[in-house]
UniProtKB/Swiss-Prot annotation:
Positions with a binding annotation for Mg(2+): 463, 465, 467
Signal peptide range in chain numbering: none
Record: residues binding Zn(2+) 2: 812, 887, 894, 897
Superkingdom: Bacteria
Subunit note: The RNAP catalytic core consists of 2 alpha, 1 beta, 1 beta' and 1 omega subunit. When a sigma factor is associated with the core the holoenzyme is formed, which can initiate transcription.
NCBIfam families tied to this protein: rpoC_TIGR
One Gene Ontology MF term: DNA binding
Name of protein: DNA-directed RNA polymerase subunit beta'
Family: Belongs to the RNA polymerase beta' chain family.
Needed cofactors: Mg(2+); Zn(2+)
Length: 1393
């Protein structure tokens, strides 16, 4: 267990150090002779009169040691001078009482007892070794049936079960001595002892080789793995049956006296007492030669008592304690949040800490925090005492403490001295990312609240409505140094998740800066004056200070001489030799801007401030940026105070056009209602159309209101507009509710209530409207409570799966790469290429397109912002970069594949815990978003547009589109995978454009992907102009359109079975709807060329839920609607849908309504119907290869006969199953899919997370392979092994001339991947504790303590950051040098002597 140690942990003694930890099954001899200090024979705990432990009982002092330090039980020996003496009267050793936390005892069992973990935990270890089922084992263990151990000369077989009647029959027939059959633990013990594992292993391997059935092979491989575990370890199978039970030290299961003479005891004592009582009773019964039936019952009861002790409730009913509560067994002590692992080993209480309410400290510098004097006195007490003793002010610790309590003046002086340069750590719970703990220089303050700098609030997610924070004091020099160098607030001004600044002025500061930098509103020419010209900035500032400034509201504030200047006045000033037109406010602002950034001459909303801070960091470094941030904070607060912006009711201006727009909307809703009444549209469509109308109204009014408040009036700026436009407070959605209308509201289930709230908050809501509002508000609060827990659990799983991913080397030298491009939606670019490639390593040289002489980036370069921008500007669409997904480091990842550390813009350092950073980056916004749901107040936010409008002039070209001319004269799209391209007018023919686009020889100005049923308003090849409507999208239905003329015939549309006629209650009209059915019917509409139905022209499958729009025998023309499938009511999008989606992706779950995807490239065809499923065939015309897909008739197809599809393309509606992408398209495509899908969820919420974080999680999900053919290796069929282990084993086998194993990549969800980690300590502390430990013990697994969690649990320094091996090597080298110096010094002295 203890290996040669290379760790330097400082605090632990050298004997306490170890490099690895091995777990195994303890033998009876180990329990009795090595662990135990004596046998417990009595169930008594303490004497009721003396309250002293009973001799031989569960708290016996003779076995466990004395209850008082250096004092034996009878009092003969007291004091330390008798150390180590064993009292001759009471037998107690004189030692420290803390040995009662270490010394164990044992209970000698009357009969062998089966350990419930090895029998009940799936897969059953005992069952697998013996080849018996769990139910058979249970009947034997609990004394219901006999099992044959040795059949002798009888016709019985080994391991055959016999009930009482059969047993008596066999005894009568063959005699009692002719065979051996037993019950209970004894029988299992004998069977396990007699099992020849080597021959069993051979036999299983042989059977595995011969078996062809996949299922049987999987079963055999699982059993083989367990047997191999026993063979390769020093464990004996019979050790799974206990003859002795270890007893936990008494101080770990204490008995505590309460008031009133009662005692509180650990549940374990009750459980042990039951075992001892039953064991003693059984021993007595066995001595008395009691009837077999009573003995058997007693043995079963003992087995149950031991089961309850190890795992209460695993077998039968749990043992209850007082108040009908199940007793906590040893398993419960380890499991779950309050178990030993998570409660005591991974989360400990910390001394030298305190907590208090926080308040804002605008006077603080960025690296400071205000610490209440009383708190500091308590926290730094030991330091103060030492300093007081060193000064000679006091001589004992007691007198120093008294002096501190008195609050003597010298104490305060000493405290001031001590805290200089001694940082403290501040933490706010929940600590969702590493910025939740930062270090500050403490500043002593009066009062009892901690003060924090306004700019660190965002990182802590803190506000001052009663939030509390904890303070921790780093004690050792190393800890102080680490806090100073790595954790100080100025070192943490960027988010590790995206590299964006987190320390940005907000609220009042933003408002003050925006006000200062606002566009000129005072033009002297309009007031009969001239534009003032100043020779430099100082002159402007002097004018400002001398004359005061002219206020927006109070007009001029000039001095007696009439001098003065308006803060927003248009002036001219000479700066750096140039005359610039600006405002005095901007001159004032530029006084604090570093000169390298140039003169900032534009308004300053919060987004621009953020960009300025980033720019500042890149140009002038951290120190100057931090100074700039402090100056921004001060200036912002001063200007906000001076501007005194406040909001009045009149500032909320209701748009004049409101009543007109509302009247219009009501008219449109009435038309839709009439269409419904006439039976033209369905209830679902009516609902959807109504919602679309109100959404549009909502947007119109919102825009009108924003324009209204942005107009300047007599007092120049509307305060409401200032607040929103600056980004200080509020947004357009909230403004809309204040002054336009509240709009559509959502029900708690997400469905939108179709009657909107047309009032706004300025007008006031009616009672009904208020009642509707409460829906949304309540949903928000309920969501917050429920989803926070979900998000926290997701973060925990992510941390667990990625915790051991650290930077282990500079460069792994891989040639692998991934390709990335900009992300767009239609013609809109959501994420430019430069943002995606910044900070990544280029995998191959990047040249200017068409100019090989101009190198933009060299292979191996880590791209900075300048290079990234140059590549983007050069028009390069895709670029090959290195990624953690393709990194070949044997453990962890390399710095080059990871790229820059986003928190500081430098290459990531060695030992950096990138896995945990990744998990926090993904988990933190999830929690934030769930907490923020209610800010929308349940306002319906539907994101879909009913029309496509072009933003450029050019020629419209249809690409990959099948269209048919509709009845209105417009083209209707018949296939799904096509697009409309707008290309520059170069005077070519349409065919030339199409050819150039297909070969990517020309760039499109815009691309609009279109789907089935889109109505294109412009013909192919027609010129279009900016702002022109080119297509209409059907939002409410998926249409099924006819593309050939002919006559209709219904096929399998049988009323009452596959269809039903529904009478519309309002109109009385009958609608034919296809319903779900279980028969052999396959509803479709066939089209024949004439009324006699002689020749079939085409068939159209009709999915369930569709409404048929044509009648049988009717003549139809191309473009006519045959049927329509309502899209259902639109639900609001919210991260509440998003978080489960992220969990579904990272857990690699199969989505509920999964889509079918094409397995090969080819053309779609249909081949009839079989067992309620449509046979869809994809045929590759080049190779003639065909792939069949059986698709349920209820599923909606998104491809049609004759469509070309590519491998991996969706054939039906729904979400894709990730495992299928892996199987069909391979690992690279799956990685791309998972990264993009997770990003999609966060992007919808406007959350920015760098791809590299998601890539690390995906890498962890794909780190295993599944063995398909073990070859000559020791690997097993169907086993999931680490890629590293797989390649290593294959290399060894090939060197020995054997056949290597074959494997396929396997995708594991994060929970499964966490449990499959190499470290059993880490896995056990995550989930399934008992199963993980049982598994590890059977195979005698060794934990090499390579990850973080296992080292924290063992109390070692973590192998990351400053604890990384490189750092440790430096430390050891320095220590060795010191030793050599000492040795040299000693030698020299000896020579002198």
């Amino acid at each position: 267990m203890f290996g040669e140690n290379s760790r330097d942990i400082g605090v632990l003694s050298k004997e306490g150090l170890f490099d690895k930890l091995e777990i195994g099954i303890a033998s009876d001899i180990t329990i009795r002779d090595k662990w135990s200090c004596g046998e417990i024979k009595k169930p008594e705990t303490i004497n009721y009169r003396t309250f002293k432990p009973e001799k031989g009982g569960l708290f016996c002092e003779k076995i466990f040691g004395p209850t008082k330090d250096w004092e034996c039980c009878c009092g003969k020996y007291k004091k330390i001078k008798h150390k180590g003496i064993v009292c001759d009267r009471c037998g107690v050793e004189v030692t420290l009482s803390k040995v009662r936390r270490e010394r164990m005892a044992h209970i000698e069992l009357a009969v062998p007892i089966v350990h419930i973990w090895f029998f009940k935990t799936t897969p059953s270890r005992i069952g697998n070794v013996l080849g018996m089922t769990a139910s058979d084992l249970e009947r034997v263990i609990y004394y219901e049936e006999y099992v044959v151990i040795d059949p002798g000369k009888t016709d019985l077989t080994k391991k055959q079960l016999l009930n009482d009647a059969q047993y008596r029959e066999v005894v009568e027939k063959w005699g009692k001595d002719a065979f051996v059959a037993k019950m209970g633990g004894e029988a299992i013990y004998d069977l396990l002892k007699s099992e020849d594992l080597q021959s069993l292993l051979k036999d299983l391997k042989e059977r595995l080789r011969k078996t062809k059935s996949q299922q049987a092979r999987m079963k055999l491989a699982k059993r083989l793995k367990i047997i191999e575990g026993f063979v390769s370890s020093s464990n004996h199978p019979e050790w799974m049956v206990l003859k002795n039970i270890p007893v936990v030290p008494p101080d770990l299961r204490p008995l505590v006296p309460l008031d009133g003479g009662r005692f509180a005891t650990s549940d374990l004592n009750d459980l042990y007492r039951r075992v001892i009582n039953r064991n003693n009773r059984l021993k007595a019964i066995l001595r008395l030669k009691t009837p077999e039936v009573i003995v058997r019952n007693e043995k079963r009861m003992l087995q149950e008592a031991v089961d309850a002790l190890f795992d209460n409730g695993r077998h039968g009913h749990p043992v209850m304690g007082a108040g009908n509560r199940p007793l906590k067994s040893l398993s419960e002590m380890l499991k779950g949040k309050n178990g030993r692992f998570r409660q005591n080993l991974l989360g400990k209480r910390v001394d030298y800490s305190g907590r208090s309410v926080i308040i804002v400290g605008p006077e603080l510098k960025f690296n400071q925090c205000g610490l209440p004097k009383e708190m500091a006195l308590e926290l730094f007490e030991p330091f103060i005492i030492k300093r007081l003793k060193d000064q000679g002010s006091v001589y004992t610790i007691r007198s120093a403490k008294k002096m501190i309590q008195r609050g003597a003046p010298e104490v305060w002086d000493v405290l001031e001295e001590i805290i200089k340069g001694h940082p403290v750590l501040l933490n706010r719970a929940p600590t969702l990312h590493r910025l939740g703990i930062q270090a500050f220089e403490p500043v002593l303050i009066e009062g009892k609240a901690i003060r924090i700098h306004p700019l660190v609030c965002a990182a802590f997610n803190a506000d001052f409505d009663g939030d509390q924070m904890a303070v921790h004091v780093p004690l050792s020099v190393e800890a102080q140094l680490e806090a100073k160098v790595l954790m100080m607030a100025p070192d943490n001004i960027f988010l590790p998740s995206s590299g964006k600044p987190v320390a940005i002025p907000s609220k009042d500061m933003t408002l003050g800066l925006y006000y200062l930098m606002a566009d000129p509103t005072y033009f002297p020419e309009e007031h009969g004056g001239k534009t003032k010209i100043f020779k430099d900035e100082i002159e402007v500032l002097r004018a400002l200070n001398n004359g005061g400034f002219i206020d927006d509201v109070f007009g001029d504030r000039r001095d007696e001489t009439g001098r003065g200047i308006h803060i927003h006045e248009k002036i001219k000033v000479r700066i750096d030799g140039q005359i610039i037109e600006t405002t005095p406010g901007r001159v004032l602002f530029n006084r604090i801007v570093p000169k390298e950034l140039g003169f900032q001459n534009y308004s300053m909303p919060s987004k621009r401030i953020s960009e300025l801070i980033l720019q500042c960091y890149k140009k002038v470094g951290l120190e100057a940026t931090v100074r700039f941030l402090d100056d921004l904070k001060d200036l912002g607060f001063i200007q906000a105070t001076k501007a005194a912006i406040s909001m009045g009711l009149k500032d909320v201006r209701i748009p004049d056009i409101k009543s007109h727009i509302l009247k219009d909307a009501y008219d449109k809703v009435a038309i839709v209602k009439k269409q419904y009444d006439d039976g033209i549209i369905t209830e679902g469509e009516r609902h959807s159309k109504t919602i679309s109308i109100w959404t549009e109204v909502s947007e119109q009014l919102s825009d009108a209101l924003y324009v209204e408040i942005s107009k300047q009036t007599r007092s120049k700026h509307n305060p409401l507009f200032l607040m929103i436009d600056s980004g200080a407070r509020g947004n357009k959605s909230q403004l809309k509710q204040l002054g336009a209308l509240r709009g559509l509201m959502a029900k708690p289930n997400g469905a939108i209530i179709e009657s909107p709230i047309t009032s706004n908050f300025r007008e006031g809501l009616t009672v009904l409207e208020y009642s509707i509002s409460s829906h949304g508000a309540r949903k928000g609060l309920a969501d917050t409570a429920l989803k926070t827990a979900d998000s926290g659990y997701l973060t925990r799983r992510l941390v667990d799966v990625a915790q051991d991913v650290i930077i282990t080397e500079k460069d792994c030298g891989t040639l692998n790469h991934i390709e990335i491009s900009a992300i767009g939606q239609g013609s809109e670019e959501l994420l430019p290429l430069k943002d995606r490639i910044y900070g990544r390593t280029v995998a191959e040289d990047v040249y200017q397109p068409g100019d090989k002489s101009r190198l933009l980036a060299q292979s191996g370069d880590v791209l900075n912002s300048v290079q990234a921008e140059a590549i983007d500007d050069a028009g390069i669409e895709t670029i090959k970069i290195r990624s953690t997904l393709t990194c070949e480091s044997p453990r962890g990842v390399c710095a080059k594949c990871y790229g820059l550390n986003l928190a500081n813009g430098r290459l990531i350092g060695m030992g950096e815990a990138v896995g945990i950073i990744a998990a926090q980056s993904i988990g933190e916004p999830g929690t934030q978003l769930t907490m923020r749901t209610f800010h929308l107040g349940g306002i319906a936010a539907t994101s879909s547009t009913p029309e496509i409008i072009t933003n450029s002039d050019g020629i419209l070209v249809y690409m990959d589109l099948r269209v048919v001319l509709g009845q209105e004269g417009h083209n209707l799209v018949l296939n799904k995978k096509g697009a409309l391209h707008v290309v520059g007018d170069e005077g070519r023919t349409l065919n030339e454009y199409k050819k150039l686009l297909s070969t990517k020889s020309i760039e499109s100005l815009e691309v609009f992907p279109v789907e089935l049923g889109v109505k294109i308003l412009v013909a192919d090849g027609t010129p279009v102009s900016q702002g022109q409507r080119i297509a209409e999208v059907e939002l409410h239905n998926i249409p099924i359109i006819c593309d050939k003329p002919g006559f209709i015939k219904y096929e399998d549309l049988v009323e009452g079975i596959s269809t039903e006629k529904v009478v519309n209650k309002n109109t009385g009209l009958v609608e034919l709807i296809v319903k779900q059915h279980r028969g052999e019917l396959h509803p479709q509409i066939a089209i024949y060329d004439d009324a006699d139905l002689s020749e079939l022209v085409g068939t159209y499958a009709i999915p369930s839920g569709a409404i048929i729009s044509v009648e049988e025998g009717q003549r139809v023309d191309p473009g006519m609607l045959l049927a329509r499938l309502p899209r259902g009511a639109i639900k609001t999008k919210d991260i509440t849908g998003g978080l489960p989606r992220v969990a579904e992706l990272v857990e690699a779950r199969k989505p509920e309504d999964a889509a079918d995807i094409a397995k090969i490239d080819g053309v779609v065809d249909f081949k009839g119907i079989q067992k309620n499923k449509r046979i869809l065939v994809v045929c590759d015309e080049m190779t003639g290869m065909e792939e069949e897909h059986l698709i349920p008739l209820t599923k909606h197809l998104i491809v049609q006969r004759g469509d070309s599809v590519i491998k991996g393309q969706q054939l039906t509606d729904g979400l894709v199953v990730p495992h299928e992408i892996l199987e069909i398209c391979g690992v690279r495509e799956l990685q791309k899919y998972l990264v993009n899908e997770v990003q999609e969820v966060y992007r919808l919420q406007g959350v920015d997370i760098n791809d590299k974080h998601i890539e690390i999680i995906v890498r962890q999900m794909l780190q295993k392979v599944r063995i398909t053919d073990p070859g000559d290796t020791t690997l097993l069929f169907g086993e999931d092994v680490n890629k590293k282990e797989f390649y290593e084993e294959n290399r060894r086998t090939e060197e020995d001339g054997g056949k290597p194993a074959q494997a396929v990549p396997v995708l594991l969800g994060i929970t499964k991947a966490s449990l499959g980690t190499e470290s059993f300590i880490s896995a056990a502390s995550f989930q399934d504790t008992t199963r993980v430990l049982t598994d590890a013990a059977c195979c005698s697994k060794t934990d090499y303590l390579l990850g973080f969690k296992e080292n924290v649990i063992m109390g070692h320094m973590i192998p990351g950051g400053t604890g990384f091996e490189t750092h440790k090597r430096i430390k050891q080298y320095l220590e060795k040098e010191q030793e050599d110096l000492v040795f040299d010094f000693v030698s020299e002295t000896e020579c002198v002597c």
